[in-house]
């Protein structure tokens, strides 16, 4: 009788817990970027944050959304991808505005060739629409160029998915690429820290949140018997996170001053 009497309470409580868990799944992934966003706004310096992190997450979440059309998964994971894409675009917008404001004589980089009389005296001849030169790609001076690049990638990937949606091999490969790309999340930051021999400007809170979140996620995969690629990619993410934390410790205790050299507009940009 007592158990039956509590039934009316347990059902809505279970529903509430499910809603909270779904909300945490949707918005939890963007929490690590809040302190980094606030630090950039406060200091007006984005040199410590690698915008290639945004590139990795944009590609991973676009692929995950396309994967959903071939193999439906839980709605919170789909909404998580949408929220993450919007968050990364906001991060790119802020970083672009801050860097352009701080670079008075920067040579503008553009994803799409456009005619502008105001820029003719400031820039060399325009590059092709798709400029995948590693020295210039993803180093543009206008947020609109990043948006155009994201839309172009989404359009091409979406069209290929539309043509191959009936192939189980393609759909599974698409899902694997989405997970593997996300596993590479910390690599741009790891490389940026190594290249500059410094973690100055990087939010340690962000990396700690990465590590705790990836550790929890990987443990969940292992304990619940998730597909092997999920567990392997999760372990790889944790290893990269720990490597970044190791860099923060090493560079803080053994700082290395870079040799003086002439600053070139293209090389002055952080990854």
Curated annotation (Swiss-Prot):
The modification Phosphoserine is found at residue 110. Keywords: Membrane, Phosphoprotein, Repeat, Transmembrane, Transmembrane helix. Its main location: membrane. It comes from the Eukaryota. The chain crosses the membrane at residues 7-27, 49-69, 72-92, 143-163, 168-188, 232-252. GO terms for cellular component: cytosol; endosome; membrane; trans-Golgi network. This is Solute carrier family 66 member 2. The keyword Cytoplasm does not apply. One of its GO terms (biological process) is phospholipid translocation. Residues 14-80, 149-215 form the PQ-loop domain. SMART domains: CTNS (SM00679). It is a multi-pass membrane protein. It is found in: Membrane. It holds the Pfam family PQ-loop.
